Amino acid sequence: MYDVIIVGGGPAGATAALYAHREGLKSLLVDKAIFPRDKICGDALSGKTVRIMRELELIDGLEQLDGSDINRITFGSPSHSQFDIHLKDSQNPRHITKGYVIPRQIFDHYLFQKAHQICETREGFTVKAVSYTHLTLPTKSSG
């Protein structure tokens, strides 16, 4: 019996499994693909993604993956004026976390492996339907 069944082992599903584990929930993570698998994507990881990786204590492993750092964003106009935002300048009081460009095949596999370490996973498993036989919702006392 599982507390949570997560359908889809990509970044959202694997991250959900990691958060469920932090809350003490027993989860099952299923995906129709077998990892590693490729996905068409721009491969950029935003500052929000990096924040979540830090929160889950996965940033050190993430930094070891084959990819590139994003340390600056440049905005340009048709008149050739430009504006740079430096993301890694911790001296700046408005410091913004740097980002990364990591191929989805690598990033998704990394997260799926981390989820596999803490929960049961099933690959090559297609969910055709969901049947609710017993559903319990936790309640909080208002007092």
Residue map of PLM features:
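Conserved small/polar residues in nucleotide/adenosyl-binding loops
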Residues: 133-139
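Conserved N-terminal glycine-rich FAD pyrophosphate-binding loop of Rossmann-like flavoproteins
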Residues: 34-54
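Conserved dinucleotide-binding and phosphotransfer motif residues
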Residues: 23, 114-118
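A conserved beta-strand/loop element that lines the FAD pocket in flavoprotein oxidoreductases
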Residues: 117-127
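A conserved beta-strand/loop capping segment in the N-terminal third of enzymes
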Residues: 55-107
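Glycine-rich FAD pyrophosphate-binding loop
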Residues: 21-41
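N-terminal Rossmann-like FAD-binding beta1-loop-alpha1 element of flavoenzymes
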Residues: 4-28
